[in-house]
Amino acid sequence: MISGLFKLSNKQSVLQNATKLVLQRRTFFNIVPNPSVGLTEDQKQFQSMALDFAQEKMKPFAEKWDKEEYFPRDVMREAAELGFGGIYVREDVGGSGLSRLDASIIIEALASADVSTTAFISIHNMCAGLIDIYGTEEQRKKFLPSLVSMEKIASYCLTEPGSGSDAGSLSTKATKDGDHYILNGSKAFISGGGDSEVYLVMVRTGAEKGPKGISCLLVEKDTPGLSFGKKEEKLGWNTQPTRALIFEDCRVPVGNLIGKEGQGFSIAMNALNGGRINIGACSLGGAQSCLVAARDHVKVRKQFNQPLEHFQAVQFKMADMATKLHASRIMIRNAAAMLDAKDPSAHVYIAMAKLFACDECFKVTDDSLQLFGGYGYLKDYPVERYLRDLRVHRILEGSDAVMRLIISRELSKDDH
């Protein structure tokens, strides 16, 4: 159902503004592969809404935001007015109540203009979705309305300085003391760190080593004992701040426990399943824009007295790029549909989709830069920004190696 997405008055203004964006939209869709192929009419409608928003509110400023490392919270709040702050949060607290497949379509469209900002919107949605699924009614009503509107934003906190891919070895400790937990430890590479008002933090509450002793706590920004490291300087994703979180005798109410004690690792992995689809969708959006840019460039750029598109090598390269992008999109959307259907093997197909899409979309972006020649290396053109932003997708939400591990473990089972 999509009523939550369209219930706000902003729907009409966005649809009215769509006329002036029609040429940009046609450019995005009038190419093989067409991102709207196979979608329902409802899905096409909110895909167009997301694309119009991206073209009008994000694309004209993305280069400036990247250069100045500006975190566009004002624009994200505008996105939330369209329902993009709680895409799969239930409607009773203001969410849009959409599926993970629907979310992937929206995220791809937004990322076509600005991968970095869209990736943070995805992370925020992941956090809101976890509270909606695992939180108590009291927690849902306390936290979700302000998160769905993006008046407050949320960050996901799993990685630590000493535990990346081996998430089950995390060491941030939460010791129970009456009606509070006392947290000590740190988290690394946290998107939104220092700016977000709400942090979903995976901590060790039990004595057991490994995943069984991990729990999930909601920590608010102004909690005494919580501090932040320096803002990291990064290759890409420059429109969102990244900092470490430091807990020093940080007292968090027991009432901020999400789910049950010991359930945190399961919650974290569930979050990553959705996050992997979203980050793959971000890769799709960036690669689609690069393919369009490369297609337009080879039509007008001439060498040896003819346009580049007349050379068979360029034609075949473009054909390969389009095929990689289309295959990636099919895999991401299939994985999202499996997650919606609660298919028990969804995590394996999600790993395949994330691995393939993030790798191949990065190659499409790199090939686009190559087709631009020296111009592609200049910041006058957006392809280099997409390339920098897409590179990290092969590391976060589970690296390429971790995806291969998940897939190979499933292949080695005898009970299929």
UniProtKB/Swiss-Prot annotation:
Residues engaged in binding FAD = 156-165, 189-191, 301, 311-312, 370-374, 399-401
- Give first and last residue of the transit peptide: 1-21
* Keywords of the record: Activator, Branched-chain amino acid catabolism, FAD, Flavoprotein, Mitochondrion, Oxidoreductase, Transit peptide
Superkingdom as given in the UniProt entry: Eukaryota
Its pathway, per UniProt, is: Amino-acid degradation; L-valine degradation
- Residue positions annotated to bind substrate are S165, N273, G274, G275, R276, R409
Q: Please verify whether the record's keywords include Transit peptide.
A: yes
GO cellular component terms, alphabetically, are: mitochondrion
List locations, semicolon-separated.
Mitochondrion
Q: Which GO terms describe its biological process?
A: lipid metabolic process; valine catabolic process
Q: What is its main location?
A: mitochondrion
Which Gene Ontology molecular-function terms are recorded? flavin adenine dinucleotide binding; short-chain 2-methyl fatty acyl-CoA dehydrogenase activity
Reaction equations catalysed: 2-methylpropanoyl-CoA + oxidized [electron-transfer flavoprotein] + H(+) = 2-methylpropenoyl-CoA + reduced [electron-transfer flavoprotein]; (2S)-2-methylbutanoyl-CoA + oxidized [electron-transfer flavoprotein] + H(+) = (2E)-2-methylbut-2-enoyl-CoA + reduced [electron-transfer flavoprotein]; propanoyl-CoA + oxidized [electron-transfer flavoprotein] + H(+) = acryloyl-CoA + reduced [electron-transfer flavoprotein]
Residues forming the catalytic site: E397 (proton acceptor)
As for family, the record states:
Belongs to the acyl-CoA dehydrogenase family.
Describe its partners and assembly state.
Homotetramer.
What is this protein's function per UniProt? Isobutyryl-CoA dehydrogenase which catalyzes one of the steps of the valine catabolic pathway. To a lesser extent, is also able to catalyze the oxidation of (2S)-2-methylbutanoyl-CoA.
What is the protein name for this chain? Isobutyryl-CoA dehydrogenase, mitochondrial
Its gene is: acad8
